[in-house]
Structure formats: structure tokens, C-alpha cells
Amino acid sequence: MKQLIDKLQTALSGTYEGHELTAIIRTICCDMLGIDTATYYLKEAVTLTTEQGTLLQGIIDRLRQGEPLQYIEGKAPFCGMEFAVNSSVLIPRPETAELVDWIVCEHATQQPRILDLGTGSGCIAIALSKQLPQATIEACDISAEVLTVAKENARMNEAPVSFFTHDMLDLGTPLPHSYDILVSNPPYIRQSEAADMSIQVTEWEPHTALFVPDDDALCFYRAIAELGQTEA
């Protein structure tokens, strides 16, 4: 195991560093060898098959180009579940789970109708569905391609979420219902800030889910606020 870790450390240290590099190496080793974290830390001797060696080199090459490991493996963890991801959807972030936790804490004894606007991978809606089984959860996105990913994640995680296509900036098109809660993780990064971000984000994650015009950075928040006044 130590040789494998050293190989990954040497190959990736120019692209990643610190805790991120440590986490990437641990994930690769555990997933490739089919072991848990405890076994990984024992660092027992392992021998890769020829097929595993070829796969490992392919992963290294893609990581060195800046492609996120989550896209390479096609999956990402969120709220104790696994979600399918590809470059059409944002990779779920741990900080987004704090939003889920807050809603669950505030509405644990209620039966709200919740709409996730710009659902992406569906991670927020699906996590809410699992943790608030008494709630009615719906989710929308402007992209049919994105909704395909979200629906697959709902199927995999056995979450009863209803999905539909909708552009949250199109305030002239009414939503199908009134909602008790509108939740969203909308784009908010100014386009001019892209130059200061890592290539793992700017070259691979969907810009439509990240960036807003410099001269109208709050466009999505303004639309959500207006929807909250007219539809919720």
C-alpha cells in the first residue's frame, strides 16, 4: 500500500496539495482496492493487477489535467448518500449539507411542500426527501440533461421527488403549485472572479450553475425572492 500511496503522492503533488491530496489518494486506493478507510490506514501490502495498473494511470492522467475525481469516478457523497455526477451538474459540496440540516431542523414536525429551484444533481431535494419523509418534495431545473441525472439519483436513493423543467428567471411562467419552502443553491460567482478560481472548477464544472454577470450578480436571488412573494 505504501508504494501505491507514494506513487500517487509523487504523480499528483504538482496539481493538488494538503488535505485535498490526502483525501484524493485515500479515495482512489479504497475504491480501486474495494477496501474501507480502516483497512487503508493499516497500509498492508497490495499488488495491483495489470488492469488495475492501467486504470490507475488513466485516473492519474485525468487528475493531472485538473478533472475532478468525482467526475472521473462518476459519483460523489452527500448527506450520507452517493450521487451520480457528470460535468453537466455541480459536484455536491459539504457546506450545502448545512442548508439541508437547517431546513430539517426547522421543519422536522411539519408537512411542508418544498421546491428545490435549479436542482442540479438533485442532492438537496433528495436529501430533504430522505430526512423529511412527511414532506412533499419537488425540484426543477432549466436543463433536461441535468434533470436526467437528478432523476437517476432519486431512483438510486429511493427518494420520492417530483421533477419538472423550469427556468427560475422566467417569472412569467407560473409554478405548478404554491410552496411552503423554496430552497436553492443558485449561481452567485461573478464572471470576473473566474480567473482566480482553480481549473478543477473553471475547466470542468458547468458555468451556468456557477457564474452570473458582473453587472447583475444577484439576478437569481432576486428572482427567488420574487417567487417567494408570489408563489409561496
Residues covered by each model-derived region:
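Conserved hydrophobic residues forming the short capping helix/wall of the S-adenosyl-L-methionine
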Residues: 12, 154, 228
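A general structural signal for well-ordered alpha-helical segments in protein cores
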Residues: 5, 25-26, 56, 69, ...
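Non-catalytic accessory regions of SAM-dependent methyltransferases
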Residues: 1-35, 41
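Mobile active-site "lid"/loop adjacent to the S-adenosyl-L-methionine
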Residues: 188-220
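Conserved SAM/SAH cofactor-binding pocket of Class I
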Residues: 95-196, 223
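Conserved Class I SAM-dependent methyltransferase catalytic core
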Residues: 214-232
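Proline-centered flexible-loop/turn and helix-kink motifs
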Residues: 14-17, 133, 159, 206
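Conserved AdoMet
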Residues: 27-105
